[in-house]
Amino acid sequence: MPMAKLRNIIKTLSIFFFLIAATAPSLSSATSATDTFVFGGCSQQKFSPASAYESNLNSLLTSLVNSATYSSYNNFTIMGSSSSDTARGLFQCRGDLSMPDCATCVARAVSQVGPLCPFTCGGALQLAGCYIKYDNISFLGQEDKTVVLKKCGSSEGYNTDGISRRDAVLTELVNGGGYFRAGGSGDVQGMGQCVGDLTVSECQDCLGTAIGRLKNDCGTAVFGDMFLAKCYARYSTDGAQHYAKSHNYKTNYGGEKTFAIIIGLLAAVVLLIIFLLFLRGVCSRGGDFSILHSFTLI
């Protein structure tokens, strides 16, 4: 093979490798807003490996993942021979997610809740984009305003105008309808959502409590989260990018590691192609390894 042609192939492969490396981080960041870990919890009651409940729980989690491909909320009950063997569970995606993003989020939540809650009968996991919960104790359709997570930022630099805008946004959330509510005013963004097993009136009551607690407990904080067992309300003062940074949320499944593995595999493929082209050049010269002395990448 002519050396000029070989060099052109190598240059093309190098450009391709660079484009993959340049675009992969942006593709990863597109999902980070839904995949970030918020909180998780497990029940104290355990089940035995290979038990009837474990089988029912696996069926339940599979149903959650499958259902998330076409619905943003659903709940299931997998009946057992006894109440303690019956698995109950639900998932809830954030109201502004597309179906593919919802399905991806729920699948990742399910993959993480097992290691988080090994052999526990109950578990719950909240990612930024979705929520899953399961237990062998009945909880579906029951309003629960227990505070699960409260997080408030600092009040430094938050002026009276900012507080007024924050209060206006939270009032808008209280007065809004539906199970998912979002709004903003200037640099203040707010969001609230109920789990879909609540009635409309229960949702309104739950969100009203969450927002009231958010205003009282976080005061003049630049951001605030109030997660109750069946609803949440949150606000930030300068949009989603600051929101993620100021909360210091981290994913639990190593997106950076996955990216590094992909880049490593691509590099190996490029090197293999270069090596095969090199061998072909050697063979075409009848085994003349003098090509080694003139071989230059670029």
From Swiss-Prot:
Cystine bridges: 42-117, 93-102, 105-130, 152-218, 194-203, 206-231
Where is it located? Cell membrane; Cell junction, Plasmodesma
- Topology in the membrane? Single-pass type I membrane protein
Q: Name one GO cellular component term.
A: plasmodesma
Subunit description: (Microbial infection) Interacts with Grapevine fanleaf virus (GFLV) 2B-MP.
Q: What does this protein do?
A: Modulates cell-to-cell trafficking.
Q: What is this protein called?
A: Plasmodesmata-located protein 7
Q: Which organism is it from?
A: Arabidopsis thaliana
